[in-house]
Structure formats: structure tokens, C-alpha cells
Amino acid sequence: MLPAGCSRRLVAELQGALDACAQRQLQLEQSLRVCRRLLHAWEPTGTRALKPPPGPETNGEDPLPACTPSPQDLKELEFLTQALEKAVRVRRGITKAGERDKAPSLKSRSIVTSSGTTASAPPHSPGQAGGHASDTRPTKGLRQTTVPAKGHPERRLLSVGDGTRVGMGARTPRPGAGLRDQQMAPSAAPQAPEAFTLKEKGHLLRLPAAFRKAASQNSSLWAQLSSTQTSDSTDAAAAKTQFLQNMQTASGGPQPRLSAVEVEAEAGRLRKACSLLRLRMREELSAAPMDWMQEYRCLLTLEGLQAMVGQCLHRLQELRAAVAEQPPRPCPVGRPPGASPSCGGRAEPAWSPQLLVYSSTQELQTLAALKLRVAVLDQQIHLEKVLMAELLPLVSAAQPQGPPWLALCRAVHSLLCEGGARVLTILRDEPAV
């Protein structure tokens, strides 16, 4: 049995490792969802509104129950529909025969316009197209253009302008369904939008205006550089140097930015310089001057050290400004995210994903798998270090005798050397009699 303090510490470490694994799993699932959404077909935002209108078959339920027509209205609507169908048949027969005059047509149109609340049934003979209606029914406040009814197809009432087109319009292939086909033809369903994939049509995406402007400037500058004749003359070399300086000035400012590696190297040099300055200052302060000349030399040395310290502080401020301009970098595995030596020791709560450069999807898959494998190995190494710090003192403090000590050694060897996967088995041979 392990001591209580050791057990609590080990349980806390294991719980922290499990929490880190769960958080890593959530991050991987989120990244996987984003990748799948990018690799699937993209639906353009402009085509979402272009949906076909619901037809007579799909419009089974009325979205406005308060506007449901009464049976009397439905009956009057049926009479009007029959009258319009008869008028269409009469018009088709008159057009085929060629016996229609324009004056009766205008007269019938004026009759239809003046009697806005009545509907006429056409005469029985084609020659009497301009006659009065034989059967009229009042329309009691019918205001809906389209009225769905059970057992009847959806029909649309014609306004005064539509009635004029019935009197003067072109032919229709069918008397009943022709009107509905003509009215539904303009609102036909558009074709389905073509699938947009990032692999095939990613080059069609447009960058923001600032990026496009910078890219055009960069391409024009490189075009000028490539057009410059390559020669060994000093004028051409000076012109190229001046041109590259102009490119750096136009792209990133008067001075090039320091990279993260350069910042780390410079910070290391500053640390070494600070340690040397500290040692030199201790030596000067600990030495007791024998005369005024030694004291004067000591003061001069301290003034020089103070000037060097000021230069180091100024350089440190420049490095901090360079780090502040750079985007945040991902924290290495095994290092607490609260402080990073590459960032000057400042705390950064959120880390951006690491930028991967790859040439194929297989290479990207290999990079991701190796990155996960390295993270797992780092976690295992950290846990083994914790186990070594907790278990080795117990083994060294125990008395090397008896089965309990052997069992403890086997358990420690299994945890530290085998990763807990295998346990050694000790065989004892009985002495021969």
C-alpha cells in the first residue's frame, strides 16, 4: 500500500492527464467538423432563397385558417371557373374559324369591365360571341386570388386585365388546365445550384481588398525585379539592393520584423549578458579599494556597467515590442500555457493553432498523426517522471527482504520500465533433497 500523501498526488496527476486528454479530444472533434464542412460541397448563400413555390399537391393545409372560404364562395368559384372555361373554348373556335370581328370583342370586354361583381356564361353558338350573359351569380366579396379546396385543384381568379386577355389572348392547348399551366409557367422551379467544392472551385473565392492590394503590389514589384537585367556591374547590384529595400519598406515598414527564433536567440544573449554584468558588479562591490585611484577606477567600472545595463534594457523593450506585433504562437506540449520564454514570460490565455505547410493530403495526415504521437509520448514521459519521484524513495526506504519487497520492486519495474503493460513473474525452484 502506498502512503496517503503519495496516493493523493498520483491520483491528482492521473486526473489531470485524463482531463487534458478529454480537452484534446474535444479540440480534435471540433477541428474534424470544420475540416468536413470545408471539404463538403458548399451551398452559395444566394441560392437559398431560390426555392420552387409550393404546387397544388404540396399545399394541402391552409396557413391562414381565418381565411377559409365558405361553401357558398366555393360554389360561386366553381361557376365562375366553368364560365371561363366555356369562354376559352368559344374563343378558340372563333379564332380557328376566322369569323370574329374586333368590335364585338371590344363590346364584350366593356361589358366584363362594367359588371365587376357579376360573371357571364358564354352563349351556346359561336356566332353570338358578343351577346349578354345567360346566367349570372353574384360574388360575395371574394378577395382571394387563390383558394384551395378539398377535391378541387387550385385555381386562380382572373382580374379585369386577365379577362381582357381571355377575350383577346392566344390559343391554349387545353381548356381547363391551360390557364393554370400558363399562370404557373413563370414561377417554375429553378435548376438546382451546382455543388461548390473547395478543391475544385477554391480559386474562385475572392480575398479581401487589403489582401488583393498587397498581392498586386508584391506581384508588380517581383515583375519589375525579374525584368531587371542580370549583370555583374556595380550599378545593377546597387539597383537590386535599393529595390529590395523598397520592397521591404512597402510591405512591412522601415525595418524588417524579427522572427520568433531571432527573438529567442536575442533573449538568450541578453540573459547571458545580464548574468555576466551581475557577477562583475558583485566583484566590484565586494572589493575594498586601498587608495583613491582604485576607488576612482571602481566608480568608472560601475558607470560603464550601468551604461551597459541601460543598453540591455533598451534592447529588451525592443524585443517586447517585436513580440507584441507578432501573432501568438502555440504553447509547446508539456509547458504550462501561463508563461512562455519565447514570449518574454508574459501570460497568454489562448493559443492559435500551429501553421502547417504541406504539399499533399497524405503529408498532412502524416504530420497530424506524428504530432498526436509526440503529444502522447510527452504525456507518458511526464507521468513516468512523477512516478519515479514518488516510488523510488519508497523502494530505497523499504527493507530488501521478504515477498512484499519483491512485489514492490516488480510493480515499480512494471510502471517505470514497461509502462504498466507487463508485469515480471518470478519463478522459484524448490531445492533438491
Curated annotation (Swiss-Prot):
It comes from the Eukaryota. Keywords: Cell projection, Cytoplasm, Cytoskeleton, Phosphoprotein. Transmembrane segments: none annotated. InterPro entries: DUF4693 (IPR031518). The keyword Phosphoprotein applies. Residues 45-69, 95-169, 326-345 are annotated as: Disordered. Residues 107-120 have a biased composition (Polar residues). One of its GO terms (cellular component) is cytoplasm. The modification Phosphoserine is found at S159. The keyword Cytoplasm applies. It is found in: Cell projection, Cilium; Cytoplasm, Cytoskeleton, Microtubule organizing center, Centrosome, Centriole. Residues 327-339 have a biased composition (Pro residues). Pfam families: DUF4693. One of its GO terms (biological process) is positive regulation of smoothened signaling pathway. Acts as a positive regulator of ciliary hedgehog signaling. Required for centriole stability. Interacts with TEDC1. Found in a complex with TEDC1, TEDC2, TUBE1 and TUBD1. This is Tubulin epsilon and delta complex protein 2. The gene is TEDC2.
